[in-house]
């Protein structure tokens, strides 16, 4: 089933080279746009140990010509049906198409027993993502997500700090992420872009799935959501381009998420407060820990001064070596299938992000706090209403 080859394996210290026999996962890529081309080049160049590019599905002739010129011996498929007909030539499918096609393509190839690796978001409706997850479980195939931002050293360090309990009991998190500035030229670049009928949403479905994934990765899904969502605030369209979200947890933890595509210069700053101090992640590249000398609980027990402050010290954390986050995700996917290594992000993570996104939209449309997850029927009816409104415009 899998081709074999020898390749160099480096130890963690990268001081020794060890040859060993390794299987290769044969991957077929669907979608040869900007990210699809990037992924294809990485795999073809051997940047992903354990993975080989077996085929690419591309519908336009210019892309097909480029594929044949730059990727010799890689099969080019004109459409998904032609690719499915050659199912014996690949083991897994990487889906890098517009997100509205992720679910039907995933179902098509899962039914053939092919492992799936999907770009974000997994799908539009959480109910549809659940259906794909169920199909993958039925067929015994892997379902991975390309949530590459989890592999950035800063976010990995933040996750390790949270998991270790270094912040104590968590109280609050505030994430301001408005570094997504998009000019009208971007929104006009394709007829389907920034529309309810084409993309089924705007800012929260296009730009923010990575950060919603990391929110639930760090803190879990909230119990309730309230979204103050603005539609076409900075642009002449009907979808969302600015949002202020409140996440509520039964534990008492509270979160705020602020994002927009029409503000510049923007920032990407996450601050998390716990009983033992504050963690700051700046631009996804630097991490600071402002550590209390005593936790707020301990200080409250021993302090006798009326306006006392807790002594604290700010330090920057040393981060691990920066590696290509996409290569890490792809190699992990291959190792999961070939060796049983746990996935960095699987279909359940794609489902959680879809559930959170659906809840945010429903809250924004109805201007009320909603429980997570919401009923799929409510979300889908709300989406259809906005699509119909857009079509009448």
Give, region by region, the residue ranges found by the protein language model:
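N-terminal Rossmann-like dinucleotide-binding module
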Residues: 10-71
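C-terminal glycine/acidic-rich active-site capping loop/insertion
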Residues: 24, 274-348, 370, 381-393
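C-terminal capping/lid region of NAD(P)-dependent oxidoreductase domains
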Residues: 22, 141, 168-172, 362-382, ...
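Beta-loop-alpha module in the N-terminal Rossmann-like domain of NAD(P)-dependent dehydrogenases
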Residues: 71-135
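Predominantly a Rossmann-like dinucleotide-binding segment in NAD(P)-dependent oxidoreductases
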Residues: 149-236, 367
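Glycine-rich phosphate/pyrophosphate-binding beta-alpha loops
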Residues: 209, 234, 258-266
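Rossmann-fold dehydrogenase core element
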Residues: 131-148, 169-172
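Hydrophobic residues in well-ordered beta-strands that form the structural core
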Residues: 78, 118, 143-145, 281
